[in-house]
A protein has these predicted regions:
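An active-site-proximal beta-strand-loop segment
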Residues: 45, 49-84, 90-91
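Acidic/histidine-rich, metal-coordinating catalytic segments
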Residues: 110-126, 144, 148, 199-201
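Conserved, non-catalytic sequence blocks in retroelement Pol enzymes and Pol-derived host proteins
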Residues: 2-3, 47-49, 65-66, 120, ...
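C-terminal domain-tail junction helix/linker
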Residues: 127, 134-138, 160-212
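Mobile genetic element proteins and their domesticated derivatives, centered on retroelements
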Residues: 10, 14, 21, 43, ...
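Active-site beta-loop-alpha junctions of metal-dependent nucleic acid enzymes
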Residues: 64, 87-109
Length: 212
């Protein structure tokens, strides 16, 4: 039978042997039944937006490296595909999502009408999460149970991230993975040309803002 070893020891041994680690990514199943309040699917697969900060969506993805799990919680603007912010942690706690939401709402202009979409994960059903949205006048929307296509925008982002970032790199440590992830998020927002926009998400938002 295998022995459980601390991920830092695994990192040290792999470094001594000159080995690097590939990352595995999979969908995190956060649905635990009706633990709070489930919102209607107001978004209804209307994934386009006329302006920034009209429709945001969020989800959680799970990574595995050096025998340890990491959880990523990003929020994406459907107007231009920009990642507004993200949090990453070793456990899928409520604070992973609440910290993400707090950071995201700091970027939302006052009295701005926003629709925030997610799946029916337990984090998004919690009273604290719903109250944080309500306090800023944000309307909550949820996918139908077990229907990933209702949040395909976020699924598409995770797919791009897999092919462009995770499967092309090897990592020496969890810390290096986090550093490279931050670089990739910046690249994705500011440099990567989105075919539909013919420019990067930030360039598209900047152009729209200047023209308005």
């Amino acid at each position: 039978r295998g022995q459980k070893v601390n991920h830092k020891k695994v990192q040290r041994i792999m470094k001594e042997l000159g080995l690097k680690c590939l990352v595995r990514m999979k969908k995190y199943k956060s649905y635990k039944g009706a633990v709070g309040e489930i919102a209607s699917n107001i978004l209804d697969r209307q994934f386009t937006a006329e302006a920034p900060n009209e429709k945001w969506t969020t989800d959680i993805s799970e990574f595995k490296l050096f025998g340890e799990k990491l959880y990523l919680s990003p929020v994406l603007d459907m107007f231009n595909g920009e990642i507004i912010t993200y949090t990453i942690g070793s456990r899928p706690t409520f604070s992973l999502v609440s910290d993400m939401l707090e950071k995201a709402l700091e970027r939302l202009p006052e009295d701005h009408k926003l629709l925030m979409h997610s799946d029916q994960g337990w984090h998004y059903q919690m009273k604290q999460y719903r109250h944080a949205l309500k306090a800023r006048g944000v309307v909550q929307s949820m996918s139908r149970k077990g229907n990933c296509h209702d949040n395909s925008v976020m699924e598409n982002f995770f797919g791009i991230m897999k092919s462009e970032f995770l499967y092309l790199k090897e990592f020496e440590s969890v810390e290096q993975f986090k550093e490279e992830l931050e670089k990739y998020m910046n690249y994705y927002n500011t440099k990567r040309i989105k075919a539909k926009l013919k420019m990067s998400p930030v360039q598209y938002r900047t152009q729209f803002t200047q023209a308005a």
